[in-house]
């Protein structure tokens, strides 16, 4: 009986050790893959379009504000010209949320 118990403890110990090594190998592979993806993303990054500048060439290129990304908003200006104009703008509800978070940060921090 003691032999079976000793053999069981040894088997559980070996199994836990081997599974821990496999998990370490998987974690290392995931970290390497994540780092390579981040490097590719940084190399692929392009200049963003500042607020109130023309974004008609790329509607997803607007810069980020402190918390939220600006949105490319298109409209037709008054004056009879039928040409669409697109600029990067911050929606009002997001502007108010940023102001509120700034006030809260100033109050507590």
Swiss-Prot record:
Cysteine disulfide partners in this protein: 48-63, 55-72, 62-88, 74-86
Localization in the cell: Secreted
Comment field on protein domains: The presence of a 'disulfide through disulfide knot' structurally defines this protein as a knottin.
GO cellular component: extracellular region
Disulfide bond found in the keyword field: yes
GO molecular function annotations of the record: toxin activity
Tissue specificity remark: Expressed by the venom gland.
Organism: Lycosa singoriensis (Wolf spider)
Prodomain residues: 21-44
Family as reported in the entry's similarity comment: Belongs to the neurotoxin 19 (CSTX) family. 01 subfamily.
Cited InterPro entries: Spider_toxin_CSTX_knottin, Spider_toxin_CSTX_Knottin_CS
Keyword Secreted: yes
Keyword annotations of the record: Disulfide bond, Knottin, Secreted, Signal, Toxin
Pfam families listed in its UniProt record: Toxin_35 (PF10530)
Entry protein name: U3-lycotoxin-Ls1x
Annotated signal sequence range: 1-20
